[in-house]
Amino acid sequence: MAAGKFASLPRHMPVNHQFPLASSMDLLSSKSPLAEHRTEAYPDVSIHGTLPRKKKGPPPIRSCDSASHMGTLPHSKSPRQSSPLTQDLILEKPLPDWKGDSFAFRDPYLLDPTLEYVKFSKERHIMDRTPERLKKELEEELLLSSEDLRSHAWYHGRIPRQVSENLVQRDGDFLVRDSLSSPGNFVLTCQWKNLAQHFKINRTVLRLSEAYSRVQYQFEMESFDSIPGLVRCYVGNRRPISQQSGAIIFQPINRTVPLWCLEERYGTSPGRGREGSFAEGRPDVVKRLSLTTGGIQARDHSLPRGNLLRNKDKSGSQPACLDHVQDRKAATLKAHQSESHLPIGCKLPPQSPSVDTSPCPNSPVFRTGSEPTLSPALVRRFSSDARAGEALRGSDSQLCPKPPPKPCKVPFLKVPPSPSPWLNSEANYCELNPAFAVGCDRGAKLLSQALDSHEMLLTAKQNGASGPRNSGINYSILDGDDQGRHWDPLAVQTDEGQEDETKFVPPVMETVSSFRPNDFESKLLPPENKPLETAMLKHAKELFTNHDARVIAQHMLSVDCKVARILEVSEDMKRSMGVSSGLELITLPHGRQLRLDIIERHNTMAIGIAVDILGCTGTLENRAGTLNKIIQVAMELKDTMGDLYSFSAIMKALEMPQITRLEKTWTALRHHYTQTAILYEKQLKPFSKILHEGRESTYVPASSVSVPLLMPLVTLMERQAVTFEGTDMWEKNDESCEIMLSHLATARFMAEASESYRMNAERVLADFQPDEEMTEILKTEFQMRLLWGSKGAEVNQNERYDKFNQILTALSRKLEPPSGKQAEL
């Protein structure tokens, strides 16, 4: 075979007739060897109709030799003359001037001209591909629904494992691809710790009823209805994909070409070869429409299965099998025929064992339109990956051709209409428990009994007894031994004389604070006292000075655990809260009062520590010593006690503007207590910043925390109109939205790990012997009475904070008067 365009001609393909070998120059010769054959025995075949008859000259040449390649024959050495055999043909591509080429004889087994033209059109269409066209097709894929996997650029389709490993280069890079070893499943490829890792996305099918099912995806813990939802959760929350690897994904690797191009590039298109698959994946490739059943059955095996390339065209009542027959104008249909009744004879895709299908009709003509469904209210969820790329017959309403079984005609459990909350007008066959309709005879016997027990049924429901579910999920898959049981209204009987201990008690919505300063019985304070009494301040300072920093930290932890309801929570309190710990209660709507109490104690504690520092009217060394003792207590709370709540209160006091402006006091601390000053600057301040930026889970092990950081969460949920401290420092950060999300995620973890915090607190306070006076001065009621007096403690919170802010400013200026250049507070 000669080089050039003749190289694309296939070899050894049998046809109906054999011709003698002839040179291409014989087409221009008047003495063609083909003249010996009678042309009447070989009817002409042409893609544009019949060739013009030859009036004079040599016998006509078959169109398969002269016109099948559409002007691809080479020039002769002499200037080519227009032949009467080819003058009416349309050249689709200008011919180059080939000179000096030598031509060999043709293969006697020539391809049918119609099929050869289709193959030539495919190859030419591929050669005409431009980056603009690919970009446009990629944009069309990305504009699909967000729940469609193809609309996400991080989905790369059927690419090999090695290729995906080469795409992820940095820690956090990830992409999703089809599993080549397990068709129908998906794999997440990412890089973590400079190592490419592959995680199979587990696919679980939940049976909602006999005829319907739902697909969910998960890695280890939480499951999702779609893969995009799964990826959004793990990327947004920076959640490790697995506990063993700890891999975190946050940087998607996006594809730059359409999915079909990736499959053809790496040769991973399922069920077809490399040569023909490149064009079959394109929607605008010219294809011949055959109206014969035999031709389509031969072509049916080449249809792609298992990919997501063409699902976007299968909608409505348009037959999906016509996706592979694009050139509809090529077929001549009669007036009474429509495209929906073309005898395409496509086979149904293989169904999963859990879904029953009816056999495909033998007739090549069948209905492809929509059919009404029995359950219009039920949203059928079919994952795009389970049936992707398969030729579907008719619209999506025929994916489950077998309807659910009809109920028994005897309404053996039918009761008169009632306003029961579980009755719903949208109930359908899927809501029926199959165990109900074991036999119609049994149902007929129970009919009269059920009608008589209707009043008892309503009474039982008011008492909290459960009836038949009206939800889309059949929980029988979770009830291993109770699958055969069904709800019997006659069995719902309760003794009015006996009280059910397991009866649900609604939680109590608390409206009054647990801090009652005027009802507080104190051994140190009189029944009525004035704000900031000197004798009380001096006695409290002596107690604070005489005790060790660790002992003070233990007392603070003990009081904090009682206020936050971590320790000493009675059963009655648990029943009224609805939960077992205050750490879970503060995340719930009816925990508002506890959140306000936590804010009150935190602010009161911070103000009391500031007063302890600013109330030292003695020498500069005394103030530095008090500051040193407070920093030591903060270190004990952080390292030994794990009480991050009181730790944040101390750090808040030390970072108040009235304290930070005391330059002489901080200088004296550096001179006399150098090690303490270094610990404060190098450890405590950076650690406090990490806590308020929501990164404590990275630097603080959960096993060492007794009381977590509560203030960011309760502040977000109970923001006051006027706060003592103004906005928190993390709210002034450029990444405040991400920090807020991190605090909310930490709150969820707090509620889940409340039992772990309780055990840690009990372990730390195992050998603790409390001192009554030290415990009293650390209680919130005592501090409120000491700071605002017996009358002022009952005043509005915002008013109290605003007035005390002015008092602290005055005390600070009295200790160290501002210079002329110093800006006023």
UniProtKB/Swiss-Prot annotation:
**Where in the sequence is Phosphoserine found?**
S32, S78, S83, S182, S290, S358, S363, S375, S471
Q: Where is the Ras-GEF domain?
A: 548-818
The modified positions for Omega-N-methylarginine read R442
Record-linked PROSITE patterns: RASGEF_CAT, SH2
**Region annotation (Disordered) ranges:** 40-84, 300-320
Record PTM: Phosphorylated on tyrosine residues.
Q: According to its UniProt record, where is this protein mainly located?
A: cytoplasm
Q: What are the annotated GO cellular component locations?
A: cytoplasm; focal adhesion; membrane
User: Annotated site (Required for interaction with NEDD9), which positions?
Assistant: R748
Tell me which UniProt keywords the record has, alphabetically: Acetylation, Cell junction, Cytoplasm, Guanine-nucleotide releasing factor, Methylation, Phosphoprotein, SH2 domain
Q: Provide the residue span(s) of the region labelled Mediates the interaction with BCAR1/p130CAS.
A: 744-748
Q: Which GO terms describe its biological process?
A: endothelin receptor signaling pathway; epidermal growth factor receptor signaling pathway; insulin receptor signaling pathway; lens morphogenesis in camera-type eye; positive regulation of cell population proliferation; positive regulation of GTPase activity; positive regulation of MAPK cascade; small GTPase-mediated signal transduction
Provide the domain comment.
The SH2 domain mediates interaction with tyrosine-phosphorylated proteins. However, not involved in the binding to phosphorylated BCAR1. Required for cell cycle progression in response to INS/insulin. Required for regulation of EGF-induced DNA synthesis.
Q: What name is this protein filed under?
A: Breast cancer anti-estrogen resistance protein 3 homolog
Name its species.
Rattus norvegicus
